[in-house]
Amino acid sequence: MMIPERPSLERRVLAAFDGSSGGDARIPVLLGGCGTGRTSVLLRLRDLIGHSAAQYIDVERVATTPERFLASIRAASPFTGHHHDELGDGAPGARAAFDASLAYLDTARAPGNGPATFLLDEFLELRTFESFPGLRTVLRDLIEVLTSAGNRFVLTTRYSARTHRLLRDAAPRFEIIPVAPLTAAEIRATLPAGAARTVSGSIDDEDDRGREDLAPLVGLIADGRPSYARMITEASATMGPRGASDPVSALSSLLGPGGTISTACRFCYELRLHRARGYGALKAILDVLADEEGLTLTEIALRLRRTPGSTKDYLSWLEDVDLIVSRHKRYSFADPMLRLWVRLHCQVTPPSEEDIAREVHAYVLARLPHSEPALAMAGVAEAAPERDKPWGIIEID
């Protein structure tokens, strides 16, 4: 599955930082949870802008010490003409190195002396530097420099609540853009020719019709998240009869111990919990919400046997790292796939194949439009199907 093209999102980002949509040029800040495709959007933008005019920086990977960060972004720079002496070459100390990094972001120029474009992936990870002497306001300093810089920037992060808090008093130049789920059309465009082949019919016709059927189902199961969609699509192409795709069985396989979706969910779960406070209590709340979503603070407190005051603190810490969301004072998982993973894997023993099949069955039915599972369970069809679909949602048991 190729990097998905997201035309509407890409146009919005490009229009924001070049000012073509009216008004002053802005700095897009892309917000999205695990697997929503923030990185793939930045890599697509680099291709569209040109590798000589844009630098992608994976902040999460290179934010070690300020000195090494500066050396890393300089070494990978596609730009010419920035003066190393002005950027603090040989200057001792973390503060000097960080100031030199900010100066580089401000003064580097693209070929022809045009503005350089910096694509900063997981920019909040620069907060790592705040443990060094003299660097207590790293993110505020970054925002101040970017606001007045003559270059162009696109920022991403997986932490929505923290970003809103950081930018609350920032200049209006920053434009927050949530990364929307992939549409069925965007998923369909990434499917390889043989990935959606159905059981009968000519190869070309069936490939086209198969992709039309497969893309919406993959989108529903994956919650529109590119990483889940890619894993489901790649696995399903190898599991169906005679090459036919079976995304439901693929999801069951991927959620087993060692499966790629299981591994991705475990990473997201542990990463976010370790960035929050109250590790054990927060895990307990996630267990409660995995059993039943849409609970109020009082209902969660009763299940935890904790006071409403302490439970409110725990919930705020989970919201701070975007593991849960609150709608009308009722709490749910931000990522439905992560909830499914918690139901399966946060237990005394690893899940059996029967456990996985049962939970995946319930998960898929809950995400389908209400009419489809009802008709399927009743054995009713409005019209005779033109062809058999390879996924047997009701027959997983």
Give the predicted meaning of each segment:
Residues 338-367:
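Short, amphipathic alpha-helical interaction segments positioned at domain boundaries
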Residues 24-43:
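Walker A/P-loop nucleotide-binding motif
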Residues 54, 64-88:
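Conserved NTP-binding/hydrolysis module of P-loop NTPases
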Residues 230-306, 355-360:
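Winged-helix-like regulatory helical subdomains adjacent to P-loop NTPase cores
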Residues 96-161, 165-169:
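Conserved Walker B catalytic segment
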Residues 31, 55-64:
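A short hydrophobic beta-strand->loop->alpha-helix junction that borders the nucleotide-binding pocket
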Residues 179-213, 221-224, 232:
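Conserved small helical "lid"/interfacial subdomain of P-loop NTPases
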Residues 305-320:
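Short amphipathic alpha-helical interaction segments
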